[in-house]
């Protein structure tokens, strides 16, 4: 006689995902400054023990490539190229940095001991991990920075006034409700901010609009 095998049927339950568009508005200026291509090449050359290039670096390449760009990195490294990019392209903040600040706010404001639950309950959906900003004015600030070794170096920082950004979040609502998520984002904007120069008060923001989309 053949053997009868009992099989356990597992029911796969779908996750009830919900979505919302969040708009954050700056409470002051934001400074955006990632490692630019000029510095990156210099570091690579130093590691390869290449002779130093005595030719003066292109300041516009430094300014332009120190930003994340939504529609790809511009190739015209000139003043006109920057002006065109600011009109036709869009500088960005990163979804990674934004979500990290949310998780940090959860811990710092003692909402939870760890940020794991929040991280697992909410995602930011962004093309290429980038969130474009809108702004009213752009400035290039020149500052002397003192590295740990060597002489002070001149750096150029992109600063934006009247900025805002809209991004889409995906959440389950099982651990953190949309109201709690909104509260966390506002706490992150007030106490942490986004971008460079946050210890100097740059990059602070608040939520200006929430739109449920599913």
Task: Describe these PLM feature segments.
Residues 1-214:
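RNA-interacting cores
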């Amino acid at each position: 006689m053949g053997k009868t095998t009992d099989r356990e049927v597992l029911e796969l339950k779908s996750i009830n995902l919900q979505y919302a568009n969040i708009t954050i508005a700056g409470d002051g200026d934001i400074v955006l400054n990632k490692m630019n291509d000029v510095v990156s090449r210099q570091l690579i050359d130093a590691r390869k023990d290449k002779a130093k290039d005595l030719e003066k670096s292109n300041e516009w390449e430094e300014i332009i490539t120190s930003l994340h760009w939504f529609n790809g990195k511009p190739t015209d490294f000139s003043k006109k190229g920057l002006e065109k990019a600011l009109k036709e392209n869009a500088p960005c903040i990163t979804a990674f940095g934004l979500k990290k600040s949310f998780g940090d706010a959860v811990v710092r404001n003692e909402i939870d001991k760890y940020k794991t639950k929040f991280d697992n309950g909410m995602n930011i959906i962004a093309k290429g991990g980038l969130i474009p900003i809108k702004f009213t004015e752009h400035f290039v600030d020149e500052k002397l920075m003192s590295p740990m070794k060597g002489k002070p170096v001149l750096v150029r920082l992109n600063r934006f006034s009247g900025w805002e950004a809209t991004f889409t979040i995906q959440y389950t609502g099982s651990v953190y409700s949309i109201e709690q998520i909104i509260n966390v984002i506002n706490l992150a904007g007030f106490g942490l901010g986004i971008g460079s120069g946050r210890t100097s008060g740059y990059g602070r923001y608040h939520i200006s609009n929430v739109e449920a989309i599913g």
